[in-house]
């Protein structure tokens, strides 16, 4: 009788330690994954997926998962996009050259939050992408600051990270990862219902 009780106690202790170890391992894996991300891709919510994982997550529950593409309208149209993704730009392209940064400057989309709220609730599962993970991280943080709680950063974006191999013909090109390189579906075809025009875009459209 006593030996049985001891065995049960040992089993309970083993199970308890197994659960604790599993929790610590999972937490460690999350921390490790976060630490491997460049600072500019990290978010306050700490929820991360790759493009392939994001597509699988959407595919499992297409009515419950929202995918946001926060690139400019021009990128969305001419570089291609995930067919289920809403285009709600975090910022729009200007025609002002930034000599220090080496590209044309962006200006914030003042309607970003209100436009996201038109398609998603603060408790919805939302996955956000941009070109390669920088703007999407900023978008996730902005949403988190305004009450959204379940927003994932798609870490590799639409185009992915650059090849860093000076001996490669593809050095500097975005072919390492990303939605377009993952085998997930993408298209150039635009569904106007999934495009949220910014104030700047509407002004341009009104002149045409």
Model region roles, listed by residue range:
Residues 7, 27-52, 57-63, 77-125, ...:
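Rhodanese-like catalytic fold shared by cysteine-dependent sulfurtransferases
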Residues 12-23:
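Bacterial N-terminal signal peptides
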Residues 128-130:
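Short, surface-exposed ligand- or partner-binding patches at beta-edge/loop junctions that are enriched
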Residues 2-14:
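Bacterial N-terminal signal peptides that target proteins for export
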Residues 66-71:
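Short hydrophobic beta-strand that contains or immediately precedes a catalytic carboxylate
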Residues 133:
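Conserved G/P- and acidic residue-centered "switch" motifs that form tight phosphate/ATP-binding loops
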